[in-house]
């Protein structure tokens, strides 16, 4: 799993925990539905920090809480 896949999986899990749809997340986080769809479908190769912060605000969690999860614990360093 790469970083973008881990971000998408984390968003899916947070939505699932709250019984939210991506559309509801879009509403509460003030992030366009197309942006969320792009992240979840793997089309966005580098979701921006500001976007992730807005999503965290919608979930009412910190960036630290977002990235402190099993999805990110198993990531290997990406070298390009």
Describe the predicted segments one by one.
Residues 15, 26, 56:
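The alpha-helix within a helix-turn-helix
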